[in-house]
Design a protein with these regions (language model features):
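Charge-rich, well-structured scaffold segments of protease-associated domains
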Residues: 1-83, 89, 99, 109, ...
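Phosphate/diphosphate-binding glycine-rich loops and adjacent basic-rich segments that engage nucleotide
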Residues: 94-105, 109-113, 121
Length: 274
C-alpha cells in the first residue's frame, strides 16, 4: 500500500478478471494469513506443484552430465505426479471507468483491456504494438508524447501479460493531478492513430530492429534467458532459436499491428488513483 504504482496494477487485474481465480490479490490479508498452518501450506504445494507442470532449466558453462546429476540429486527421489484440477477461463467483463480517492501526491492511471493468451498467433503483433506504445526505449510513442514533448508525466509504460487461457494489456502513467486528463487525451489520440493508420515500411523496419536488439541484449542475462527458456518449453514444448524468433518478427506486417490495435483497444477500461 506504500506504492500506489504497484497497488493500482493489483487492483486493475482484480477488476479486469473479476469473478475468476485470477481476480483476487494473491498476497492475502492479515486474517487469511493468520489461518494458514504448515499443514495447509504443505497441502497447497502437493496439490499445485506437480511434476507434469515442472521444467528444469539451466543456462551456463556447465556440462550436461553435471546438470543432470544435480537435478537427479534434488528431484530424482520425488514420485511423478499429475495436476488434477484446471482453471476456468475468466469470463469477459464490461468495460469500466473508476476513480478512487487515495489522497496520493500524483494521479496514477491504468488504461487497459483483456488480450490474447500465450498460445495465440497474434501475440507477436501485439507484443510489437505494446513495445511501440510504451516499451523500455526512450523513443516509445507514449514516452515521447507525454514526457519528452509535453513534460506531463515522468513515468509511463505499456505491458502485455499473456496467460495460458487469457491475457491483459495495460498502459500506465503517473502525473500531477491537473495534467491527468490531458495525458488521457494524448494516449487516446495515439491509440486512435495506431488503430486507423498502418505504420510506414521504414518505421516498421526500425521498430522490428529495435525489438530484436532488445531481445538479443536480454539474452545476455543468463538468469533471464534461463527463465525464458524454461517457460517456453513448459508452455510450448519447444524453445525457439534466435534465428527462428528473427524470422517470426520479420514476418509481422503493418496491417496486422493495426488490426490488433483495433481489436484490443477499441474498448478499454480505466482505473484512476488520485
Amino acid at each position: 500500500k506504500d506504492s500506489p504504482a504497484d497497488m493500482i496494477f493489483d487492483r486493475f487485474e482484480d477488476m479486469i478478471f473479476a469473478g475468476s481465480e485470477l481476480g483476487h490479490n494473491i498476497l492475502g490479508t492479515k486474517s487469511t494469513l493468520a489461518r494458514h498452518t504448515s499443514q495447509s501450506i504443505k497441502r497447497f504445494i502437493e496439490r499445485t506443484h506437480t511434476t507434469d507442470q515442472m521444467v528444469f532449466s539451466s543456462i551456463g558453462n556447465m556440462p550436461t552430465s553435471r546438470v543432470q546429476s544435480v537435478a537427479e540429486r534434488y528431484f530424482g527421489q520425488h514420485e511423478a505426479t499429475t495436476r488434477t484440477f484446471s482453471r476456468t477461463k475468466p469470463e469477459a467483463v464490461e468495460p469500466f471507468t473508476q476513480t478512487v480517492s487515495k489522497h496520493t501526491h500524483q494521479t496514477h492511471c491504468i488504461i487497459g483491456a483483456r488480450a490474447y493468451d500465450i498460445h495465440a498467433e497474434r501475440r507477436l503483433p501485439l507484443s510489437l504494438l505494446i513495445n511501440i506504445l510504451g516499451g523500455p526505449s526512450a523513443n516509445s510513442r507514449l514516452n515521447v508524447v507525454l514526457r519528452e514533448k509535453n513534460g506531463l508525466s515522468y513515468n509511463t509504460e505499456a505491458v502485455y501479460t499473456p496467460y495460458n487461457d487469457c491475457g491483459m494489456v495495460a498502459i500506465y502513467f503517473s502525473s500531477d493531478h491537473h495534467n491527468a486528463d490531458h495525458c488521457r487525451e494524448l494516449i487516446d489520440r495515439e491509440l486512435r492513430t495506431l488503430r486507423s493508420e498502418p505504420l510506414s515500411a521504414r518505421r516498421l523496419a526500425m521498430i522490428k530492429r529495435q525489438f530484436l536488439a532488445q531481445m538479443a541484449i536480454s539474452m545476455e542475462n543468463n538468469e533471464g534467458y534461463m527463465l525464458g527458456a524454461g517457460k517456453s518449453y513448459l508452455v510450448h514444448d519447444e524453445i525457439d532459436t534466435l534465428e527462428e524468433v528473427y524470422r517470426k518478427v520479420s514476418a509481422v506486417k503493418a496491417e496486422q499491428i493495426m488490426e490488433v490495435a483495433e481489436e484490443i483497444f477499441s474498448k478499454t477500461s480505466t482505473l484512476i488513483y488520485q
